[in-house]
Design a protein with these regions (language model features):
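Conserved H-D interstitial segment of serine endopeptidase catalytic domains
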Residues: 2-6, 23-26, 30-74, 135-136, ...
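A conserved glycine-rich beta-strand in the N-terminal activation segment of trypsin-fold
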Residues: 3-20, 76-77
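Short glycine/serine/proline-enriched coil/turn segments at secondary-structure junctions
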Residues: 7-9, 54-55, 73-76, 107-108, ...
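Conserved SET/PR-domain catalytic core that frames the SAM/AdoMet-binding pocket
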Residues: 19-22, 26-27, 87, 113
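Short, solvent-exposed loop/turn segments at the edges of secondary structure
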Residues: 41, 77-79, 94
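Chymotrypsin/trypsin-fold serine protease catalytic domain
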Residues: 50, 61, 81, 86-87, ...
């Protein structure tokens, strides 16, 4: 799924379906340039079931509410997540389904394969992809990530 400006087709942020009415996304996607400059729910639409933005075949959902983590810090991206509440539920299908959440936090999936998807830039020129991109990666430990990011990973 992708977040778009109403009337447009090019996603500028992604997210994950967690229920038929809720999307998990990055909090920085729900603000303009500062913590004081939160976007209005009506300024965001959610494209669901989209694979190729050039074909205009997607379900479009409006956002009724944006709930960001209360400790989100726009300057350093701490707690960078928001929940979008949709005005109408998503009809689940082979193209649109909620993410699978772990049954237990005891398993961190270190060493397992995870698939990452998005419409991000595909080259140095900064052009976004028109088709949903995906790559398989190996999940690293929290400790390794925290070391790599100089202790900036929050629990």
């Amino acid at each position: 799924m992708g977040l778009v400006t109403p009337g447009e087709q090019t996603p500028w942020c992604g997210g994950s379906i967690i229920t038929s009415l809720h999307i998990l996304t990055a909090a920085h996607c729900t603000y303009y340039t500062s913590i004081e400059d939160v976007k209005a729910p009506a300024s965001i639409q959610v494209l669901v079931g989209e694979h190729d933005t050039s074909d205009s075949i997607a379900d479009v959902h409006n956002v009724s509410k944006i709930t960001s983590h209360p400790r989100f810090n726009h300057d350093n991206a701490d707690y960078d997540f928001s929940i979008l509440t949709l005005t109408t539920p998503i009809n689940f299908s082979s193209k649109a389904a909620p993410i699978c959440l772990p049954a237990s936090v005891a398993s961190l999936y270190t060493g397992q394969v995870a698939t990452v998807t998005g419409w991000g830039d595909t080259g140095a020129d900064g052009s976004p992809a028109s088709t949903l991109q995906e790559v398989d990666v190996i999940v690293e430990s929290n400790e390794k990530c925290n070391d790599y990011y100089s202790g900036k990973i929050k629990e």
